[in-house]
Amino acid sequence: MPDWKIPALCLVAALAFIEPSDISSRLKTPPAAETIRGRSGTSSRPAPQGTHYRGRVTSVHDGDTVRITDTDGRRHKVRLAYIDAPEIGQTHGIESRDRLRRILSDETVDVQVTDTDRYGREVAYLFSDGLDINLSQIENGAAWHYTSIAKKQQPKADFATYAAAEAYAQAERTGLWAKREPLAPWLFRKQQHTAQPQ
């Protein structure tokens, strides 16, 4: 048996004693949302790290990227923190996007910015009525826990909750986990990049 399967089996065995509601009950509620002040116009400049604001989801690009207009009318492109959803051209990519559209289209959300990515998108936790949307995508088999980033930056308690949610979805064969070994989006992107003529 490969070395990685033993810890995975232990985690799945431990999760057998966890109810889905136990994972959901560990969803954190964001601090009181505060409007971003002092920024002019409808700038698409990302909000500073640690910023909290409230806004309406105006579009869902894919299973981990949305556009939000905050309460002051400023537009934000937001990448959901610590998850990686299948790309649109990949198996389950459309399902992941459509799930996020169903739960977020035209919804008001609380945004907790953690970083800005290399594309200038805010990287953030999103909450809708107290529900951690990022975690919900993992829990429902619509995204992976993006551990290569999360293990360096995500708070340990959140990391453990997200890892447990992914293991549960995997054990239940939910969403993208219905397939035995689904191709992770970071590997899909690497394959696409390698296949492009130089």
Model-flagged regions — what are they?
Residues 1-198:
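Small beta-barrel nucleic-acid-binding modules, primarily SNase/OB-fold domains
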